[in-house]
Amino acid sequence: MTSGSSSQQSVGLAAKVGAGVLALWGVLHVWVGVEGARQFATNGTRALWTMFLGGANAPVSAYQHPTDAVTSTVQGHLALNFCLDVGAAGLLGLALAWMIWKQASWSAYFIALVVIGVIDNAFLFTQVTPGLIALDAGTIGGPVLWAVACIVTPFGLPSIRAQRPVGASSVPA
């Protein structure tokens, strides 16, 4: 039996559920990247900012868009970069979900736990909780999906203690 098939057999239901939830997180974040790029390409900087704003402390109606071209261009490209980074994080989430589902990868789990955790919690605590971006199902959905995936996944992964390095013999010397 190859190591790929043995690790595939060792992926439990909880890990598959966690991987599915992480994949959903990835799709949500890829959508943000695509929608941000679409808004910027079709309607410019104002539309892109309108996509973000709307929190209790930053209502769309109160936000003053820059009037000079340089500031507007800089802000637009920074916001576009943010959207593309979010989309790239979504692709990372999809890749990690696949690795968990197919390979029972503890490495993928820990990358999701730490890297995606930093990404989502930075967004939550620097944008949503201060009231800059609206607190709604879309903005809280990502952190909730991440938390569910992190809580559920380990229960379906093989014991981390039972894993041996590739090429290690199971017969004692």
PLM regions: where:
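Topology signature of small-to-medium multi-pass alpha-helical membrane proteins
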Residues: 2-173
